[in-house]
């Protein structure tokens, strides 16, 4: 890195700092976002202090970093949606891709997810949904949301709406009851069906039926719709029997039956900071040997360009990356990069990642398989478009 004259250095340091502040990013977040090596935040701090000067390539990377949200609402969109437990907006993105749906309300509590959401959609989600009166939520055609898997009270034998109080699913149910959206899409882990000996899933379905919605469910893997990931989730779609005439016409999308390949999401050149250390690699190998000896199936998993798909990307991936490690020739394996994690969930290349690598892994691990959402959204819109009510 070269030392520069005071005037030029001052101009560049001011430009970098002003850009970073406009983006509402820390030095660490900006360094990770533009693909700098380990300790990139220290480098940016030196640039901002005028101690050293970035190369033309580095300046260009910072200047090119987008400041305008790429997925703002389309003004011509016909249908309105709300996005609950929104995360970074993966479900909203799937509906946005239909070009027929715009968001009028969203809710999320994680400050880092909110930052990513705002950078991409241009609007900031409201906070804690439990503190928002359902009457204050705008009218909408479609409600979407993912919610944590929680056991319900078993006070009543019916297992319906009243039994859901005190859970985050209740927040969804009370909004559906008050606002009567034409349709909804809920996403959850596949274990929802067996959680609490099946009572949780039964209570959810009973509650939605009680609210007079026609309900459809399906299990899909991310690779069913073109992603090289084995992530399996349950999808619950509902239509208001009172306002949709053809609610029984809905059919879940058909899986593509296409072979996937991990190489399709991998970058050709990856910074060494993603290669795991000797200490971590030794630990992974030791634990795998111990687990095998004790009859446990847990441990790291290696993948390469030709692997058909990876394990499920989880929110804990930032810790050690053991569930998805990429083989490297004559080197320790590496973790996937945040951009590769985004691709593994089907996020487009222009999706902005304005947070640190650690937060990015959490966010994509907590998000949804966007192509699956898009496929279901198109099928839902077919029904809404043909409804005669």
From Swiss-Prot:
Protein keywords: DNA-binding, Methyltransferase, Restriction system, S-adenosyl-L-methionine, Transcription, Transcription regulation, Transferase
Transferase as UniProt keyword: yes
InterPro entries assigned to the protein according to its UniProt record, in alphabetical order: C5-MTase, C5_DNA_meth_AS, C5_MeTfrase, C5_meth_CS, Cro/C1-type_HTH, Lambda_DNA-bd_dom_sf, SAM-dependent_MTases_sf
Active site: residue positions: 149
GO biological process: DNA restriction-modification system; methylation
A GO term, aspect molecular function: DNA (cytosine-5-)-methyltransferase activity
Protein's UniProt keywords contain Methyltransferase: yes
EC identifiers of the protein: 2.1.1.37
Family annotation (NCBIfam families): dcm
Protein name according to UniProt: Type II methyltransferase M1.ScrFI
Encoding gene per record: scrFIAM
